[in-house]
């Protein structure tokens, strides 16, 4: 079996500067990925590589397979598994990177710092009873969705490459093993702070929090209350992130605190899915039996997670714990009003509305209620409203929608900008295509069952320009037929 050794990749352009590895040793465990027998390269994201200042074109497929399987690490890599905890479906537990290795932090040519992480790269001390491996299907799924989210303009981790391992993984069935290379602003999670707080490690907690501020929010370093400002900053950007999810009908599916990044990137695409017909109670995750992480519940869960973040850093907010609790409470209680303001602004953009009117909330809610009752497609409804004439589809012909449409036309007349500006705004806010679940599943099934990658590459191509209405996109705009509907998604761990 090959060993996980370092290899020189000067021509590729790696530039590692590993600051997390300089933090106290109990934050992580340093260890190499577990070598694999027969790695094969599946896909490389050359567009992302170019953004990172990396060039894989001079490397052979075998060299890249060795690299992205973890068998041969880039020079300067300093692999480790991060420790963290988390509230999973509301229950606290100790976790950590059970099947992932942070290879190091790469500096891009423009000075941006990103984590390079392997996922499915072998057991670590945090694996609990897991085998440390990942299957090809779920890794391809994360590749598809994360890159689609990026194209949609939503903050997200990215996918750089996938390699198969030549080994089987055992889930409900025997599956092909694979390793995903993930790129992230960092892997600092709310659960990372919870891990240290649970151990009452105030010194370590302060080091971690100072590190997070320096890495992600340097503008608040000189604040008189930097830790309170951190809480407010993370809350503000999480509100923006969740609002963006709602804009495109995205349902994360497993919003545990270990899956909330303080960088405010979308992270960990397990049982995620996109809503077809509008229903605020939509749930896809097979393990979310009570609908905790349903589409419309995501803002409330974000607030709950942020409250856990506030609890974790409470000792840093003020030396008087009662004053600290009051400061945290005031910040968390502001969530609802801030979210409503952000959501309302987003919905105005979806409808091409400029300016604000007091009836806007009731007006927007009226459309959503009609969409739910008529089982209207969430994505296509907003695109149909961009047509020059009243939409012709049968479900638009009822009196309730016609009445709403007339009100919308009147509201547009009150806009502070002309109608072409409204169309431009709507076009930039409402995607033509999303990663519809049945399309994703069809692409994955073709790969897993027939080793046919054509549907995968076609889907990736379509999703790379989601706001352009091209003729070749026609079939990808269609909602699923009844027999095509995906009713459940799975974690894949």
Curated annotation (Swiss-Prot):
Nucleotidyltransferase involved in the post-translational modification of proteins. It can catalyze the addition of adenosine monophosphate (AMP) or uridine monophosphate (UMP) to a protein, resulting in modifications known as AMPylation and UMPylation. PANTHER family: PROTEIN ADENYLYLTRANSFERASE SELO, MITOCHONDRIAL, SELENOPROTEIN O. The active site is at residue 258. Its cofactor is Mg(2+); Mn(2+). Mg(2+) binds at residues 259, 268. Its EC number is 2.7.7.-, 2.7.7.108. Residues 471-493 are annotated as: Disordered. This is Protein nucleotidyltransferase YdiU. InterPro entries: SelO (IPR003846). ATP binds at residues 96, 98-99, 119, 131-132, 182, 189, 268. It comes from Nitrosococcus oceani (strain ATCC 19707 / BCRC 17464 / JCM 30415 / NCIMB 11848 / C-107). GO terms for molecular function: AMPylase activity; ATP binding; magnesium ion binding. Belongs to the SELO family. It catalyses: L-seryl-[protein] + ATP = 3-O-(5'-adenylyl)-L-seryl-[protein] + diphosphate; L-threonyl-[protein] + ATP = 3-O-(5'-adenylyl)-L-threonyl-[protein] + diphosphate; L-tyrosyl-[protein] + ATP = O-(5'-adenylyl)-L-tyrosyl-[protein] + diphosphate; L-histidyl-[protein] + UTP = N(tele)-(5'-uridylyl)-L-histidyl-[protein] + diphosphate. HAMAP family: YdiU_SelO (MF_00692). Keywords: ATP-binding, Magnesium, Manganese, Metal-binding, Nucleotide-binding, Nucleotidyltransferase, Transferase.
